[in-house]
């Protein structure tokens, strides 16, 4: 079909096509990573994405990480800045990179984590990281 021609290259700050919102494209991404600390990149599940929001009048991005994932939490705890990269199936370059300055971290229950992303497990405890989106 002709669908293949609408491949979107948003990595170079190009705007995604109007038909698909950024949230839809994020949901459609095949994987996501967080780069924190000394450029250490770790793969996190898409369930960690909590979406964009507003806090203190700033645009923020929410991440929820299972407390059992000690590596990811340790890196996030040690970092003031981090970036979240989203990849499409079969692509080694991210189509979207969100640069964040960490504002706060708080513990959330599994139920709260599920509200942010239905893929999370209601029985677990999570850390929620709030990062100001740096343009």
What are these regions (language model features)?
Residues 1-135:
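Basic, polyanion-binding surface patches
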